Amino acid sequence: MSESDRLFAQPQQRVADFVFNEDVVRVFPDMIKRSVPGYPTIVENIGVLGAQFAQPNSVLYDLGCSLGAVTQSLRRHVRNDGCRVIGVDNSHAMIERCSEYLHAQDAMYQELLPVELIEADILALDLQPTSLVAMNFTLQFVAPDQRLGLLRRIRQALLPGGALILSEKLRFADAQEHALLTDLHIAFKRANGYSELEIAQKRSALENVMLPDTFEEHRERLLAAGFSRVSQWFQCLNFASMIALP
């Protein structure tokens, strides 16, 4: 069971860049629930939507799988014969805890898809032919100049009829819209018990690590990577999820 997120509750003389280490892993489920509006809806529906694109005897990828929430959702919803999920994350602590969570899921459910967990940098990963790739709040942590190359490799690996489901925090080209949705997101975090100090220090920790794009930038990049259609299927405040088709 996860702990309550208090990582930024005490004043820090110097706020270090955010990393997905053991401290974050311990509180991650609580952190994500209290920080990302709509997160449970996104995760559950990646499984629902993913089942529409998953093909028999194919690989499904969860790139940047963290604790495996999307992997678990895919295992619950996809029923195609011969499918398996590959979860990939570069954090050793995340992969270890994810494995524990998946073993717990195996104890509760029968006939779930098999899973392989890989500790690796997704930028260096050799992708197998795949009918579905999920990246749930992962691309925003990839260096901007490496995002197009990664998406091109994903597009090349996708089977005909497959899909990429991409969830990201958004920024907005219109300054007033960006300010409004940023303020509303801060209000969401306040309502979930975060103090002004916690909000400010976490923002400082993330500002050089997580670099969001606008939806228009995502769409243009996905089209440049070879995708034919990009549709946004969900948005709550400044968090969104989209489907890109080959």
Curated annotation (Swiss-Prot):
Pfam families according to UniProt: Methyltransf_25
Positions contributing to S-adenosyl-L-methionine binding: Y39, G64, C65, S66, D89, N90, D121, I122, N136, R203
SUPFAM superfamilies hit by this protein: S-adenosyl-L-methionine-dependent methyltransferases
Catalysed conversion reaction: prephenate + S-adenosyl-L-methionine = carboxy-S-adenosyl-L-methionine + 3-phenylpyruvate + H2O
Keyword Iron-sulfur part of the UniProt annotation: no
Cited NCBIfam families: carboxy-S-adenosyl-L-methionine synthase CmoA, PRK15451.1
Official protein name in the record: Carboxy-S-adenosyl-L-methionine synthase
Lineage: Bacteria, Pseudomonadati, Pseudomonadota, Gammaproteobacteria, Pseudomonadales
Designated gene of the protein: cmoA
